[in-house]
């Protein structure tokens, strides 16, 4: 009887420890604020970071319009309720639908060769266009452009990551 109680106690302790390990691991991952799809850190990409809240209450943070397009395609039955994006200059999260968007220009985009930048006000967007080029757009056009660019951008990302792996492998 004593052995049976000891066995139950050991199982209980293992379960409790497993729960704590999972909880702490989850908190560590969530605390990093990394893109759900590519792992890029929010601290480095606040100027393009997007927070997507879906109708079902779930939410995700992604580094760019590119990764937001991936999320929208994968969650076709869970439409977004709110989408916020980082203002290019301040990194402050703003409503993506109300943002002043610029597509293109000479500044390399995040996860894309055709940049898509959001600005909180028109003056900032106009100043950016004067300095870097591009054209004004609304959010719907930005998302359409992201889907149009997806194939080429994915090939570009795969090529860059392969080159980085090769560099790391060299002595």
Each language-model region and where it sits:
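A short alpha-helix capping/helix-coil boundary motif
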Residues: 3-4, 14, 104-106
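Bacterial N-terminal signal peptides
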Residues: 12-24
